[in-house]
């Protein structure tokens, strides 16, 4: 195995751990988890949740350092559009587009003292345009 494959494997493992941390965080915050890793040819959404009457499509991002910015800053417009595409597919299969929907980001920063988790509600809109930055 080359170093690049090892690093990629480490990133994937960290990503899976971040998704588990995000799911537990959202559950404790009162979100109902509806689905995980809903994927289509056009995109994927990490978590589908319900907060009250709102269906929330959640992108989970993680970093080991904020020296280059927080994990939430790594969601570009292209990634947001892919999440929206997967969310649209999920909504059409599960109640239709008339549901109230929101696109959130959960940022997990792995620190020595333990992971730091932040929720950004409405991080981008249904067209993939950022709402936070």
Swiss-Prot record:
Q: Which Pfam families match?
A: UPF0102
Task: Spell out the InterPro entries in the cross-references.
Answer: Restrct_endonuc-II-like, tRNA_endonuc-like_dom_sf, UPF0102_YraN-like
GO molecular function annotations of the record:
nucleic acid binding
The family classification in the record reads: Belongs to the UPF0102 family.
Which PANTHER family does this one have? UPF0102 PROTEIN YRAN (PTHR34039:SF1)
Q: What is this protein called?
A: UPF0102 protein Anae109_1947
Task: Report the source organism.
Answer: Anaeromyxobacter sp. (strain Fw109-5)
